[in-house]
UniProtKB/Swiss-Prot annotation:
One of its GO terms (molecular function) is metal ion binding. Keywords: ATP-binding, Cytoplasm, Kinase, Magnesium, Metal-binding, Nucleotide metabolism, Nucleotide-binding, Phosphoprotein, Transferase. It comes from Exiguobacterium sibiricum (strain DSM 17290 / CCUG 55495 / CIP 109462 / JCM 13490 / 255-15). Its cofactor is Mg(2+). InterPro entries: NDK-like_dom (IPR034907), NDK-like_dom_sf (IPR036850), Nucleoside_diP_kinase (IPR001564), Nucleoside_diP_kinase_AS (IPR023005). Its EC number is 2.7.4.6. This is Nucleoside diphosphate kinase. The gene is ndk.
């Protein structure tokens, strides 16, 4: 069964949206195999956003991700990467449709409540970063 990495970002945690986001995931029929609330280190944030390391907004991404606790999730289900991305919505709040998590809750490009892996390969990489040394198949 396919797995993906989802993360409730610091703004989502601060605004009390964890329960709403988890409920949406579970209502879709997906199973949360693992979940942890944690304070992200600068090293983990840099590794997570490594693909953006040369971009001018990289520092802002790292600062935001380390600004408060996050909830990291290992989620399993059929076609979970693609379906969860549709549930999340577009990165830009103005482009995210109502009914998507970002369409309903995002404020800005960076304060967009949630992260979700954009491919099976990204999911494997991100799950390895966030749940180190733990098996991908539960």
């Amino acid at each position: 069964m396919e797995q993906t990495f989802l993360m409730v970002k610091p703004d989502g945690v601060e605004r009390g949206l964890i329960g709403e986001i988890i409920a949406r995931i579970e209502r879709k029929g997906f199973v949360i195999r693992e979940m942890k609330m944690m304070q992200v280190t600068e090293e983990l944030a840099q590794a997570h956003y490594a693909e953006h390391a040369e971009k001018p907004f990289f520092g802002e991404l790292v600062t935001f991700l380390t600004s408060g606790p996050v909830v990291a999730l290992r989620v399993e289900g059929e076609d979970v990467v693609t379906v969860s991305r549709m549930m999340i919505g577009k990165t830009k709040p103005t482009e995210a449709l109502p009914g998507t998590i970002r369409g309903d809750f995002a404020n800005t490009m960076s304060e967009n409540v949630i992260h979700g892996s954009d491919s099976v390969e990204s999911a494997e990489r991100e799950l390895g970063l966030w749940f180190q040394g733990q098996p991908l198949n539960v």
